[in-house]
Amino acid sequence: MAKEKYDRSKPHVNIGTIGHVDHGKTTLTAAITTVLARRLPTSVNQPKDYASIDAAPEERERGITINTAHVEYETETRHYAHIDAPGHADYVKNMITGAAQMDGAILVVASTDGPMPQTREHILLSRQVGVKHLIVFMNKVDLVDDEELLELVEMEIRDLLSEYDFPGDDLPVIQGSALKALEGDSKYEDIIMELMSTVDEYIPEPERDTDKPLLLPVEDVFSITGRGTVASGRIDRGTVRVNDEIEIVGIKEETKKAVVTGVEMFRKQLDEGLAGDNVGILLRGVQRDEIERGQVIAKPGSINPHTKFKGEVYILSKDEGGRHTPFFNNYRPQFYFRTTDVTGSIELPAGTEMVMPGDNVTINVELIHPIAVEQGTTFSIREGGRTVGSGIVSEIEA
């Protein structure tokens, strides 16, 4: 059989399974792939068993070792990439490094236990890193005889979600058994199909990177005699065309406006540069010393420079090449945003004396220069050129 081309006709969505250890995240992932392969056989829908998902290869993302399984499958209307992080620490690292961007997630809660500490932590992290759409799968319902108990567990989950600003009263809760579905029990297979149609309907199609406002982190700047100043870098999101008005944001106190007079890639003139392209942008009315690496070129008004923010961070363990000792309040490392390092001081949350290598923690940061940041911007924490932590902006403060 000839190899099929990757079909772009279906919208692509990234999702994942989250929840407490042993509540059935990986079993559910296996059940989804297996039931879809039985009910909707296509070249994409191949059954994956628990063992193959559980034996996720180690990946390194920004210097951090993470185990994550990636599986793909499709429904009638969409193509999905699904991530399953086996260990709790892997999940935390995944969320904080932005290694696995999720458009939505399935929160798996065992009906036999109800919400547990990691259930809460995963909901909080989803809120912090901007995963806006959660669907609940109450697993192991075949092991609970009491209908009232199931209702209580559902109420408890909904209350917990509301506590973290998710629409707890309205979001979908599906009750089933991943193991029974995997074993081929048709009643529970139907529930997996119901879960997938809920995912299709409830998790909105993500905005494509090219539809978002322009953001181009500046990597290099040079001047061309007689033509002006060129800034180069990879377009993070959005598009850029000749005659577009842009802003140069970050590092300097004021944001400068300019007009694009040329877009080049591989020394060829382009009509427009798109997200993902490495381009050189010719700017009118900008002197060579008015723009530098670490600033961003952006659509006017779309992103602002800030010095104070809250961040959710993971501090590398000694084994990952991180620090060997804890750090304390007012620790002053470098924060690496996109293309540059900026010194900043860290304020720890009340009641936290110190942070150990391998911990994750919410911190307040104050940078010495303003940088173009927004909720969801990722950064590394560095000391003497080596990475000691990784983080994501959860809230802008000033």
Swiss-Prot record:
Gene3D superfamilies per record: P-loop containing nucleotide triphosphate hydrolases (3.40.50.300), Translation factors (2.40.30.10)
Residue span of region G2: 63-67
Enzymatic reactions: GTP + H2O = GDP + phosphate + H(+)
Residues the record lists as binding GTP: 19-26, 84-88, 139-142
Subcellular location: Cytoplasm
Binding site for Mg(2+): 26
Pfam families: GTP_EFTU, GTP_EFTU_D2, GTP_EFTU_D3
Positions of region (G1): 19-26
Keyword match Hydrolase: yes
G3: region residues: 84-87
Keyword Magnesium appears in the UniProt entry: yes
Region entry G5, spans: 177-179
Coiled coil regions, renumbered to chain: none
Function: GTP hydrolase that promotes the GTP-dependent binding of aminoacyl-tRNA to the A-site of ribosomes during protein biosynthesis.
Subunit structure, as described in the record: Monomer.
Protein name stated in the entry: Elongation factor Tu
